[in-house]
Structures are given as C-alpha cells and as structure tokens.
C-alpha cells in the first residue's frame, strides 16, 4: 500500500494547508494535481492599488507530498526442497527484468558455467566477470560454510549468491530459478541453506531395460533442480551389459551406450554437480558376462549351473571382473564404484560347502581350515573393493554382502548400501551401524520402483515417502535410533527393471517424478515438513512444471 508523509515543523497546519492546496489545484486542473488547466487567481504579495505593507503575509508553501512505499515482511521462497532458513526483510524482492543480468564476482571465474545456465533459464543476459549493477544477479565463491551450502541475499534490487564451493552456489541458483518459476519473483531477505545429507540421488537399472543417453540426461536435469547429487548407474546384470567395452567387447549387449555417449552423460552430470556411480555387480548378477564365458559359470556338485553366479574359486573369474572394474574406473571420474556383492546364489542353499565343494576348498586354502563359502564370498568383496580403491574410488556394496560371524570380515571402508532385510545374509541395520559402518539408505519398502511389481513389490508413492519415511528408516517402517544419524550418508531412489516390458521409458519417468521429489525434500531437510502432502504436491507442480 502507499503511504504519503507530510514533512514540516507544524504537521497539523501543514497537512491542512496541503490538503486545501491540493484540492484547489485539482479542481482547477481537471482533477489532476499536475494538470495543465488554467490556474485560479491567488494572492501574490502585491497587487494594483494595494499597499504592500497592507498585504497579508503568506505562510511558507508546504512541501509537495512525497510518496513512499512500505512492504510487509517477506516470506520464505516457495521451493522444492524447501530452504532451511530464511531471514525475512521488507522490500520489493527481485524479478528478472531489464536491466538485470547475471555476473560473476572477482576470483570466481569457476562459476561461469553456472552463470550462463542461470541466465538462459531466467531469460536475462550473462555478463561474465563484471561488477554487479542495478537488478543484477551476482555469483561468488567465498565463506566458510559446510560443503554444498549457500547464502542467497536479495537486497536493494539485486541478488547475490555465495557459497564455499561451486556446488553450493549452483544450488542457490536452483532456489532462485524455482522461486521465479513459481511466483515470478524472489522475495526480499537472506536464505541460508545446506543439505542434511551428503549423498542424495537416483539409481537406474539400464542392464535389464535399456534407456537411451537422452533419457538419462533428462533425469540428470530433473535431479539437479531438486538439488540431488548422485546418480547410480547399474549397467551389468543377467539380462545385459550396456556400455561398450574395450577390454571385453564380447560381453556387450546389442543395445548399449557407446563410450562417447557415456562421456556426454558424464559431462552433463559434472556441469550439474552430479556424480555418476557405476555398478558392476559380482559375484552374482553376471549373466551377461557369463554368456560369453560359460566356463566361469558356477556349477554345483551335480554340474547344474546357477544363474548369474560366477565361480569365485577360479582365478580367471577374478581376472575378468577386475579387468572391467579397472576399465570403467578410468571412464567414470567420480569418487565411488559400486561392486554389488548381493544375492550370490552359492549362499542360498542349505549347505553351501556340500553343494559347492570347490568353493569350500578354495576358502580353506585362502583363509584357513575354519573358513567356508561365506568367507570366500566376503574375501571376494574385499578384493574387488581393493581394485577400485587403487583407482581412487570408494567402494559401495549391497548390505546382504556383509556377513556376520565368519573368518573374513568386510573391509570397514566399504559403504553399505542398505536395501533389504529379507535376503539371506541381510542383517538389521543397527548391526552395521553398531560396527561403525557408513550406510546409504535404499530401503526397498519405500524407495524401490520395480517394474511390473513382482515379488510383492508395489510402486512407491511420493506421499508415503513424504509422510512416513526419513533417512533413519533403513528397513521396513521402523527408524534406527537417532544417535546413528551421522553414519547415514543419505539415500537414493532406485528403479529396477525386473519386468522390463511393464512400462515404457516415458511411463517410468512419469512414475518416479513425485517419489523422487519427495525423497529430495527428505534428504535435504529430514525434519518434519511444514506443508501437507497436498500443498507440497501443488507446489512441486508449480515450480517444476
């Protein structure tokens, strides 16, 4: 609303005089105080036939009313995920209108890509390294906040986004983009924001169902706007091996990504501050590899092969898997490599040693007379983790590959990807945490989107994730004690293509949209959300389109 202030030492008379003067001027100018109508005669100090000394003394003219604008306190920007803290202020906020542009502060040249992207999204010019002018958005590195944190300040018609690293500044630009998309503006005030968890993402199985590079790139763009930073790529399984290989081209499926396509995906991911985590699962889930190398297939004492399982008693088995781990460690620049370790079929029978005597003999030879098949499998995990560690990666593995009570213990440096408590070898999550292990949450109760809904899986809903799940809920619906929160590194939503024909790629993209959005909210800020689910869903539609 507009408020007019009348200035002067005598507010009462001045107000009255001003009101009269305005009324007079308005009446004589067709109702416009600054109109061009003919002015009425007014005392002018002297007039013909009148003594100056007899003229009435005129009061000093009252100042022209000066319009000023007052603003209510701003409210937090409406974004997904919600910002964690907003200091309200009075002011008009910011809109992307001329002469606004995007500039990068001195000593922040590394933010050029972020600046160009934001400028294009907002439809304003990118001016590069330049001093911020009226209406500009300035990106700057600096400060001592946590990794991926940022501060976004709207003041004096400008926006300034700062952070200790490029990722944090990038997330600030996502907040600005969403606020403008949803309401046309960014509210006045200061946003201070940072993620609750360092690993936040999506996992996609392209081994069972091929997805194109373009489809994957679209998911990366969606993830970036949700401030998600990790994309798990499961590209090897019984049904297919989906990335070209130089070391073993014989194992590659007809439908696959070329290395040029993978590099394009990786370049986009890097520009969006997303790490792509490759996964080659072993010693199970290797059917595509074994079709080209049947001599390495695990067979029981009767000679019956086990689907997807490699015979880990054979040195050639380790050689081929290690060849692949080294090849793709070089292709993928990120800091993690997922080595699988789940559902090894040799461990699902009543007596692994009796059914697979070659594995039992190899275990005793390598780890001593008390060792069994479980120990050989655990040693396999440690050996594969050592290969990717030598390439500069942190190994990840599924939780049912970490066994209790054996001669061999899984390396403490391997991150536990907790997905289920239902498989043989799986333990309650508190056991892993009590051992001091770090865990990433992929709870199949909430975060598994399994095509065709086999084995009693149902498609997860965003509402259920939003209302019931937190990173502490690792298994089923029960959270682990809050004291373990620092060991839980984050979470990913996972797409598995068990019945590949059940949905088209477009249906998958649509089906995971709201569950992934809900996950993004809960890993950015694990506290109880302030919006109801219906409010959140409406907001997500507004800011994401």
Model-derived segments and their meaning:
Residues 395-400, 407-545:
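Flexible, acidic glycine-rich loops studded with aromatic residues
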Residues 199-203, 230-232, 273-277, 336-338, ...:
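Structural preference for beta-strand elements that scaffold enzyme active sites
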Residues 3-11, 15-17, 21, 29-37, ...:
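Acidic, contiguous N-terminal accessory segments
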Residues 207, 236-240, 279-285, 342-344, ...:
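Active-site beta-loop-alpha junctions enriched in small/polar residues
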């Amino acid at each position: 609303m507009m408020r007019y202030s009348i200035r002067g030492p005598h507010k009462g008379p001045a107000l009255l005089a001003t009101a009269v003067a305005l009324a007079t001027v308005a009446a004589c100018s067709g109702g416009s105080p600054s109109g061009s109508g003919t002015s009425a005669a007014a005392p002018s100090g002297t007039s013909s036939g009148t003594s100056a000394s007899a003229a009435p003394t005129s009061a000093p003219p009252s100042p022209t009313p000066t319009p000023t604008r007052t603003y209510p306190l701003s409210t937090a920007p409406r974004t997904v995920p919600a910002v964690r803290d907003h200091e309200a202020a009075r002011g008009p906020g910011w809109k992307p209108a001329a002469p606004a542009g995007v500039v990068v502060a001195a000593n922040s040249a590394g933010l050029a890509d972020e600046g160009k992207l934001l400028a294009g999204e907002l439809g304003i010019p990118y001016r590069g390294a330049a001093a911020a002018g009226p209406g500009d958005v300035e990106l700057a590195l600096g400060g001592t906040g946590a990794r991926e944190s940022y501060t976004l300040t709207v003041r004096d018609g400008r926006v300034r986004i700062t952070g200790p690293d490029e990722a944090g500044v990038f997330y600030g630009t996502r907040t600005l983009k969403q606020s403008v998309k949803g309401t046309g503006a960014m509210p006045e005030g200061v946003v201070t924001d940072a993620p609750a968890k360092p690993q936040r993402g999506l996992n996609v199985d392209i081994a069972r169902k091929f997805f194109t590079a373009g489809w994957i790139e679209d998911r990366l763009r969606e993830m970036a706007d949700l401030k998600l930073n990790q994309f798990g790529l499961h590209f090897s399984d019984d049904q297919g091996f989906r990335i070209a290989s130089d070391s073993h081209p014989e194992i590659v499926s007809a439908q696959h990504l070329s290395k040029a396509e993978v590099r394009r995906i990786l370049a986009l991911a890097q520009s969006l501050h997303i790490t792509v985590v490759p996964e080659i699962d072993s010693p199970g889930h290797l059917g595509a590899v074994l079709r080209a190398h049947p001599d390495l297939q695990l067979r029981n004492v009767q000679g019956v092969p086990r689907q997807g399982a490699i015979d880990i008693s054979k040195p050639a088995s380790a050689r081929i898997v290690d060849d692949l781990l080294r090849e793709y460690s070089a292709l993928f620049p990120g800091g993690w490599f997922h080595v699988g370790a789940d559902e090894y079929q040799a461990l699902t029978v009543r007596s692994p040693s009796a059914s697979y005597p070659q594995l039992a003999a190899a275990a005793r030879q390598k780890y001593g007379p008390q060792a069994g098949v479980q120990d050989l499998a655990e040693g396999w995990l440690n050996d594969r983790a050592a290969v990717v560690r030598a390439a500069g990666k942190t190994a990840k593995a599924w939780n049912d590959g970490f066994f209790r009570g054996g001669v061999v213990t899984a390396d403490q440096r391997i991150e536990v990807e907790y997905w289920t408590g239902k498989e043989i070898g799986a333990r309650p999550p508190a056991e892993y945490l009590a051992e001091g292990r770090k865990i990433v949450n992929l709870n199949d109760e909430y975060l598994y989107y399994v095509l065709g809904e086999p084995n009693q899986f149902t498609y997860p809903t965003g509402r259920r994730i939003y209302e019931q799940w937190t990173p502490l809920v690792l298994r089923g619906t029960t959270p682990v004690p809050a004291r373990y929160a620092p060991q839980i590194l984050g979470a990913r939503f996972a797409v598995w293509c068990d019945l590949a024909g059940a949905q088209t790629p477009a249906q998958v993209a649509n089906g995971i949209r709201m569950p992934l959005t809900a996950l993004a909210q809960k890993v950015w800020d694990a506290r109880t959300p302030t919006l109801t689910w219906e409010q959140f869903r409406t907001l997500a539609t507004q800011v994401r389109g």
